[in-house]
Protein backbone atom coordinates (compact mmCIF):
# COMPACT_ATOMS: atom_id res chain seq x y z
CA UNK A 1 0.00 0.00 0.00
CA UNK A 2 1.26 3.48 -0.90
CA UNK A 3 1.44 5.12 2.52
CA UNK A 4 2.07 8.57 1.06
CA UNK A 5 -1.27 8.38 -0.75
CA UNK A 6 -2.96 7.30 2.49
CA UNK A 7 -1.49 10.31 4.30
CA UNK A 8 -2.72 12.59 1.52
CA UNK A 9 -6.19 11.04 1.70
CA UNK A 10 -6.33 11.54 5.47
CA UNK A 11 -5.49 15.21 4.94
CA UNK A 12 -8.21 15.43 2.28
CA UNK A 13 -10.80 13.91 4.63
CA UNK A 14 -9.67 16.19 7.45
CA UNK A 15 -10.03 19.22 5.17
CA UNK A 16 -13.52 18.13 4.13
CA UNK A 17 -14.56 17.75 7.75
CA UNK A 18 -13.12 21.18 8.59
CA UNK A 19 -14.64 22.93 5.56
CA UNK A 20 -18.07 21.38 6.20
CA UNK A 21 -18.04 22.41 9.85
CA UNK A 22 -18.00 18.82 11.10
CA UNK A 23 -15.16 19.79 13.44
CA UNK A 24 -13.24 22.91 14.43
CA UNK A 25 -9.70 23.76 15.54
CA UNK A 26 -7.91 20.66 16.83
CA UNK A 27 -11.10 18.64 17.37
CA UNK A 28 -11.58 15.13 16.03
CA UNK A 29 -9.15 12.53 14.72
CA UNK A 30 -8.78 10.25 11.71
CA UNK A 31 -6.86 7.04 11.12
CA UNK A 32 -6.31 4.37 8.49
CA UNK A 33 -4.99 0.84 8.99
CA UNK A 34 -2.43 -0.01 6.30
CA UNK A 35 -1.25 -3.33 7.81
CA UNK A 36 -2.43 -5.51 10.71
CA UNK A 37 -0.26 -3.62 13.20
CA UNK A 38 0.51 -0.43 11.30
CA UNK A 39 -1.83 2.57 11.34
CA UNK A 40 -1.49 6.12 10.02
CA UNK A 41 -3.27 8.74 12.12
CA UNK A 42 -3.73 12.45 12.59
CA UNK A 43 -1.51 14.06 15.24
CA UNK A 44 -2.65 15.60 18.50
CA UNK A 45 -3.31 19.32 18.83
CA UNK A 46 -3.22 20.28 15.13
CA UNK A 47 -6.16 21.97 13.39
CA UNK A 48 -7.67 19.68 10.77
CA UNK A 49 -7.91 22.66 8.44
CA UNK A 50 -4.13 23.17 8.44
CA UNK A 51 -2.75 19.66 8.20
CA UNK A 52 -0.12 18.44 5.78
CA UNK A 53 0.71 14.82 4.84
CA UNK A 54 4.11 14.96 6.55
CA UNK A 55 2.37 15.69 9.86
CA UNK A 56 0.74 12.25 9.98
CA UNK A 57 2.02 9.83 12.60
CA UNK A 58 2.53 6.10 12.15
CA UNK A 59 1.76 3.88 15.13
CA UNK A 60 1.07 0.29 16.08
CA UNK A 61 -2.28 -0.87 17.44
CA UNK A 62 -1.30 0.27 20.94
CA UNK A 63 -0.43 3.76 19.74
CA UNK A 64 3.33 3.32 19.97
CA UNK A 65 5.23 5.29 17.29
CA UNK A 66 6.73 3.27 14.45
CA UNK A 67 8.47 6.21 12.79
CA UNK A 68 10.31 9.22 14.28
CA UNK A 69 8.12 12.32 14.62
CA UNK A 70 7.94 15.53 16.61
CA UNK A 71 4.17 15.04 16.82
CA UNK A 72 2.18 12.61 18.96
CA UNK A 73 -0.83 10.52 18.05
CA UNK A 74 -4.15 11.82 19.35
CA UNK A 75 -4.87 11.19 23.02
CA UNK A 76 -8.11 9.59 21.83
CA UNK A 77 -6.20 6.77 20.19
CA UNK A 78 -7.77 4.16 22.52
CA UNK A 79 -11.11 4.76 20.75
CA UNK A 80 -9.54 3.91 17.40
CA UNK A 81 -7.77 0.89 18.88
CA UNK A 82 -10.93 -0.67 20.30
CA UNK A 83 -12.73 -0.21 16.97
CA UNK A 84 -9.94 -1.91 15.00
CA UNK A 85 -9.74 -4.73 17.53
CA UNK A 86 -13.50 -5.33 17.52
CA UNK A 87 -13.91 -5.15 13.75
CA UNK A 88 -11.24 -6.83 11.57
CA UNK A 89 -13.18 -5.60 8.53
CA UNK A 90 -12.61 -1.96 9.48
CA UNK A 91 -9.59 -0.08 8.10
CA UNK A 92 -10.57 3.56 8.64
CA UNK A 93 -12.01 5.60 11.51
CA UNK A 94 -13.28 9.19 11.43
CA UNK A 95 -14.20 10.94 14.67
CA UNK A 96 -15.64 14.47 14.65
CA UNK A 97 -18.11 16.77 16.35
CA UNK A 98 -20.81 17.37 13.70
CA UNK A 99 -23.25 20.01 15.07
CA UNK A 100 -26.56 18.20 14.54
CA UNK A 101 -25.24 14.75 15.41
CA UNK A 102 -23.50 16.12 18.48
CA UNK A 103 -26.68 18.02 19.35
CA UNK A 104 -28.51 14.68 19.39
CA UNK A 105 -25.78 13.25 21.62
CA UNK A 106 -26.00 16.19 24.03
CA UNK A 107 -29.80 15.89 24.12
CA UNK A 108 -29.51 12.18 24.95
CA UNK A 109 -30.99 11.05 21.62
CA UNK A 110 -29.86 8.25 19.34
CA UNK A 111 -30.50 8.18 15.60
CA UNK A 112 -32.87 5.32 16.22
CA UNK A 113 -35.76 5.67 13.78
CA UNK A 114 -35.96 4.49 10.18
CA UNK A 115 -36.91 7.78 8.53
CA UNK A 116 -34.98 7.60 5.23
CA UNK A 117 -34.68 4.50 3.05
CA UNK A 118 -31.21 5.48 1.80
CA UNK A 119 -29.95 5.65 5.38
CA UNK A 120 -31.32 2.22 6.25
CA UNK A 121 -29.51 0.88 3.18
CA UNK A 122 -26.16 2.58 3.70
CA UNK A 123 -25.76 3.26 7.41
CA UNK A 124 -28.42 1.74 9.63
CA UNK A 125 -29.13 3.25 13.00
CA UNK A 126 -26.60 5.05 15.16
CA UNK A 127 -26.93 4.21 18.86
CA UNK A 128 -26.06 6.62 21.64
CA UNK A 129 -23.19 5.40 23.80
CA UNK A 130 -23.13 6.56 27.41
CA UNK A 131 -20.80 9.37 28.39
CA UNK A 132 -17.20 8.44 29.03
CA UNK A 133 -14.30 10.74 29.71
CA UNK A 134 -12.37 11.20 26.43
CA UNK A 135 -9.03 9.41 26.19
CA UNK A 136 -9.93 7.02 29.03
CA UNK A 137 -11.17 3.46 29.46
CA UNK A 138 -14.58 4.94 30.31
CA UNK A 139 -15.09 5.94 26.68
CA UNK A 140 -13.89 2.69 25.14
CA UNK A 141 -16.04 0.69 27.56
CA UNK A 142 -19.05 2.82 26.58
CA UNK A 143 -18.72 2.30 22.83
CA UNK A 144 -17.45 -1.29 22.70
CA UNK A 145 -20.87 -3.02 23.10
CA UNK A 146 -22.19 -1.31 19.95
CA UNK A 147 -19.28 -1.84 17.58
CA UNK A 148 -20.07 -5.28 16.18
CA UNK A 149 -23.38 -4.46 14.50
CA UNK A 150 -23.21 -0.69 13.90
CA UNK A 151 -21.05 1.44 11.60
CA UNK A 152 -21.50 4.78 13.35
CA UNK A 153 -22.10 5.87 16.92
CA UNK A 154 -23.15 8.96 18.82
CA UNK A 155 -21.24 9.54 22.05
CA UNK A 156 -23.09 11.34 24.82
CA UNK A 157 -21.90 14.93 25.35
CA UNK A 158 -19.00 14.32 23.01
CA UNK A 159 -19.52 13.75 19.30
CA UNK A 160 -19.76 11.03 16.68
CA UNK A 161 -17.56 8.36 15.15
CA UNK A 162 -17.93 6.40 11.90
CA UNK A 163 -15.80 3.56 10.58
CA UNK A 164 -15.56 1.51 7.40
CA UNK A 165 -13.22 -0.39 5.10
CA UNK A 166 -11.90 2.79 3.47
CA UNK A 167 -11.41 6.42 4.48
CA UNK A 168 -13.91 7.61 1.88
CA UNK A 169 -16.57 5.19 3.12
CA UNK A 170 -15.98 6.18 6.75
CA UNK A 171 -16.31 9.87 5.86
CA UNK A 172 -19.46 9.16 3.85
CA UNK A 173 -21.01 7.42 6.84
CA UNK A 174 -20.17 10.36 9.10
CA UNK A 175 -21.59 12.82 6.57
CA UNK A 176 -24.74 10.70 6.20
CA UNK A 177 -25.11 10.59 9.98
CA UNK A 178 -24.92 14.38 10.25
CA UNK A 179 -27.28 14.95 7.30
CA UNK A 180 -29.85 12.55 8.75
CA UNK A 181 -29.69 14.15 12.19
CA UNK A 182 -30.31 17.51 10.53
CA UNK A 183 -33.35 16.17 8.65
CA UNK A 184 -34.64 14.54 11.84
CA UNK A 185 -34.20 17.82 13.71
CA UNK A 186 -36.16 19.71 11.03
CA UNK A 187 -38.96 17.12 11.03
CA UNK A 188 -39.23 17.22 14.81
CA UNK A 189 -39.27 21.02 14.72
CA UNK A 190 -42.23 20.81 12.32
CA UNK A 191 -44.00 18.60 14.85
CA UNK A 192 -44.00 15.21 13.15
CA UNK A 193 -41.33 12.62 12.39
CA UNK A 194 -42.93 9.77 10.45
CA UNK A 195 -41.08 6.49 10.11
CA UNK A 196 -40.86 3.87 7.40
CA UNK A 197 -43.25 0.93 8.06
CA UNK A 198 -41.73 -2.22 9.54
CA UNK A 199 -42.40 -4.32 6.44
CA UNK A 200 -40.56 -1.75 4.28
CA UNK A 201 -37.58 -1.77 6.66
CA UNK A 202 -37.41 -5.55 6.31
CA UNK A 203 -37.24 -5.20 2.52
CA UNK A 204 -34.46 -2.64 2.82
CA UNK A 205 -32.53 -4.95 5.13
CA UNK A 206 -32.87 -7.76 2.58
CA UNK A 207 -31.45 -5.50 -0.14
CA UNK A 208 -28.60 -4.46 2.13
CA UNK A 209 -27.76 -8.08 2.94
CA UNK A 210 -27.85 -9.10 -0.74
CA UNK A 211 -25.43 -6.29 -1.54
CA UNK A 212 -23.06 -7.52 1.16
CA UNK A 213 -23.42 -4.29 3.15
CA UNK A 214 -24.79 -6.03 6.25
CA UNK A 215 -24.34 -9.46 7.77
CA UNK A 216 -27.62 -11.33 8.44
CA UNK A 217 -26.93 -11.45 12.18
CA UNK A 218 -26.63 -7.65 12.24
CA UNK A 219 -30.35 -7.37 11.53
CA UNK A 220 -31.27 -8.60 15.00
CA UNK A 221 -28.13 -7.12 16.52
CA UNK A 222 -29.29 -3.56 15.88
CA UNK A 223 -30.08 -1.93 19.23
CA UNK A 224 -32.23 0.80 17.69
CA UNK A 225 -35.92 0.57 16.85
CA UNK A 226 -35.33 -0.98 13.42
CA UNK A 227 -36.70 -4.41 14.24
CA UNK A 228 -40.35 -5.31 13.46
CA UNK A 229 -42.83 -3.86 15.89
CA UNK A 230 -40.33 -1.41 17.38
CA UNK A 231 -39.82 1.12 14.59
CA UNK A 232 -40.36 4.41 16.37
CA UNK A 233 -43.64 5.78 17.60
CA UNK A 234 -45.28 6.46 14.25
CA UNK A 235 -45.38 4.64 10.94
CA UNK A 236 -46.33 5.93 7.54
CA UNK A 237 -48.17 4.13 4.77
CA UNK A 238 -51.44 4.16 2.86
CA UNK A 239 -54.35 5.88 4.64
CA UNK A 240 -55.99 2.53 5.26
CA UNK A 241 -52.96 1.35 7.21
CA UNK A 242 -53.76 3.81 10.00
CA UNK A 243 -57.48 3.13 10.48
CA UNK A 244 -56.85 1.11 13.63
CA UNK A 245 -54.11 3.36 14.97
CA UNK A 246 -54.51 4.25 18.65
CA UNK A 247 -54.66 7.94 19.51
CA UNK A 248 -54.00 9.32 23.00
CA UNK A 249 -55.84 12.39 24.30
CA UNK A 250 -55.57 14.27 27.55
CA UNK A 251 -58.72 14.67 29.67
CA UNK A 252 -58.93 18.35 28.67
CA UNK A 253 -58.63 17.49 24.97
CA UNK A 254 -61.31 14.81 25.26
CA UNK A 255 -63.71 17.18 27.04
CA UNK A 256 -63.12 19.85 24.41
CA UNK A 257 -63.74 17.34 21.61
CA UNK A 258 -67.02 16.19 23.20
CA UNK A 259 -68.18 19.78 23.76
CA UNK A 260 -67.47 20.69 20.14
CA UNK A 261 -69.28 17.56 18.95
CA UNK A 262 -72.32 18.46 21.07
CA UNK A 263 -72.38 21.92 19.54
CA UNK A 264 -72.64 20.39 16.08
CA UNK A 265 -75.83 18.56 17.04
CA UNK A 266 -77.32 21.76 18.46
CA UNK A 267 -77.03 23.63 15.17
Annotate the PLM regions:
Residues 1-267:
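Glycine-rich flexible loops
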Amino acid sequence: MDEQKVKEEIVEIATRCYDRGLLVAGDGNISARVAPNRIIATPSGVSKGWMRPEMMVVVDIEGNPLEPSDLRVSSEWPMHRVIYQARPDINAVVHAHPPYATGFAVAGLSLSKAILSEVVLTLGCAPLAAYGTPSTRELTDAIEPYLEFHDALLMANHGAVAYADTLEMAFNKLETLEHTCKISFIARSLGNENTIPDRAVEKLFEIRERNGAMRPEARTGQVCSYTPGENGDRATGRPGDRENEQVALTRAELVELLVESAKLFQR
